[in-house]
Amino acid sequence: MLTELDPALPHAVRAELAREAVDAARRGAIAPDHVSRDARERARVLSLALLGPVVNATGVLLHTNLGRAPLGAAALDSMTRASGYTNVEYRLAEGVRGSRHEHAGALLAMACGAEAGIVVNNNAAAVLLVLATLARGRSVLVSRGELVEIGGGFRIPEILAETGARLVEVGTTNRTRLSDYERARSEEVALVLKVHTSNYRMIGFVASTSVAELARFDEPVVVDAGSGLLDEATPWLRERPPWLRDELGVRQCIEAGAALVTFSGDKLLGGPQAGIIVGRRAFVDRLKAHPLARALRADKLTLAGLQAIAHAYLSGDAASIPFWRMACEPVDALRVRAEVIAAGVPGVKVVDTEAVAGGGTLPGLAIPSCGVAVEPPSVNALTARLRAARIVPRVDDDRVVCDLRTVDPADDARLAAALRATDGHSR
């Protein structure tokens, strides 16, 4: 029976799956003559559950469930070179112990015009570290319109409570003025937290207070910029894309007077998962000295990947980062690829689509795109067969759509082959 199971699985795993199938038969859960089939199905399900590459044909560039920003050759090469011994906490110039905050964090701070930086394992951890360091036992002012919930049910008030800080809600959900903050100030206030609403947008009768206005206060202003757009001007691109309108830039927050800015590494920055904190050196040094900094620190591979990403921005080569390359690929180029795929697969049509950034960024803003679509008798059957080939499409009404903006050109042939193999399920 073991030889019938996926040979990529270790022998011990295949043996355990076979035992589970036999046990199921003994309990009467399956018929005795279905043991082999049950074991094969268990192996198939496990093989698909294990981490591995997938073709993201959803049109969601920063798909959280599919790993957000894909890494390019430069970042992967940097991570590979750091996989052995590396000077993660060693100063080669002096021959003494160093700090893991001297590499990627410092370069990322330079890239957005800040004095210093530190890297932790995600942006929620970054906010947690800032609040625990600067506001434990004291009050934090937050606009009611910025008490956001991020993915997985985690909410800003709950994160704040875990740090021992006290939440002081300011203004109303739709309108918060500078005068609202003024009235809430007291000696108990440690800082003002401004949260960029990167996963939703309010329109209509709304008002908010800018970082520059808040920076007039004596209390430090901390900005959770979330999405991680380093610079609103996007100097690494030929022109600023229209779908980036109103997106908050880290550099602009620093220039406006923010004491600290936190953001994600695997969103618009285009790097590995990380939480990045940049700002004034005095505050960053306090963060580095807090016990939580060690508990939340990033590993050497993450730091190496971010170092390469920072190099790309500092050298003006960020357009080569996969996220930006895919997001800015001309629609005409996508259409040419779609026509090639459609020409080789019966029943497949070229369609204009709309991609999105995803990952809790740029809500409501679409990116014009192009892909291929199929109208099968059974949408569920076709998508299941594509997923078995590790291809994740999206479903629009009764169509299965593969949006090429999120498909690497190197995977076009693989996508076409999978669609041909499912031809019987697409008509």
Predicted regions and their residues:
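Long amphipathic alpha-helical segments
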Residues: 1-46
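N-terminal glycine-rich anion-binding loops that anchor highly charged ligand groups
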Residues: 7-26, 53-55, 187-190, 312-313, ...
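Glycine-rich phosphate-binding segment of PLP-dependent enzymes
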Residues: 18, 57-58, 68-93
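Glycine-rich, N-terminal phosphate-binding loop and its surrounding beta-alpha-beta segment
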Residues: 27-65, 69-71
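Short Gly/Ser/Thr- and Asp/Glu-enriched loop/turn motifs at secondary-structure junctions
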Residues: 55-59, 268-272, 367, 394-400
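Conserved PLP-enzyme active-site core in the AAT-like
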Residues: 94-300, 304-307, 418
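Conserved PLP-dependent catalytic core of the aminotransferase class-I/II
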Residues: 142, 302-303, 307-358
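Conserved C-terminal alpha-helix-loop-beta "cap" of PLP-dependent enzymes
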Residues: 335-411
